[in-house]
Amino acid sequence: MAASKAKGKLVSIVINNEYIKICEITKSGKNSVVHKTVTIPAPEDCYVEGVIEQTDVLAKAIKVVMDEHRFNANNVAFSISSPRLATKEVLIPNVKANKIDKLVQANATEYFPVNMDEYIIQYTVLEKVEDQGQEKIKLMVAAVPSEVVESYYGLAKALGLKVAFVDYAGNSTYQIMKQQIGPEVSLVIQVENDGTVINIFKDNVLQLQRNVPYGKSMLVNAVMEKYGLKLSLIHI
């Protein structure tokens, strides 16, 4: 899902049907320096189950904010959140790093019972483990519809930016949390408007991650229906 391994300054953008988070950072090795960050409401009907719709409308809203706050990076990184994204933990033989991708792609249909021609596969190496006396590599494998990824590339083009990489929200959460938790078993829940990512860590390693297609909007709608409230009266 990566397009170019950009270093230096870039814009990081997270989009859902509730808000857009825009952050300008400088990457140097494993370190990142945050220069500025802005959150704005998402235009209506521009985000549908992870797919960017009405690209021109969305690009215009983002450009206005970037110009106002003087963002000047030329590269963009997207973090995708979609109920259509699936993840699975898998064990593979202890092969060299440059052999992992080929092995994952070859076995993708065993991980996910979908038409792989319509999906893009990405993986994250979690740890090396011993399984039945043999050393193996534990991976977190993600499958995201090509339609979703392509819509983000279309947005980048409309913004006049070059795609540095496209990641999925679960991996972004994992990369942050593994630096902040200890060896104890930890449950990390990331609740968004229309989806929730559940993570279980042990010994600072991700053991399980699942995307649930239910979020804050379901709870809000239930409260509104039960008590006859309007959305403007509910503070989320």
Residue ranges and their predicted role:
Residues M1-I234:
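Hydrophobic/aromatic-enriched cytosolic interaction surfaces used to assemble or bind macromolecules
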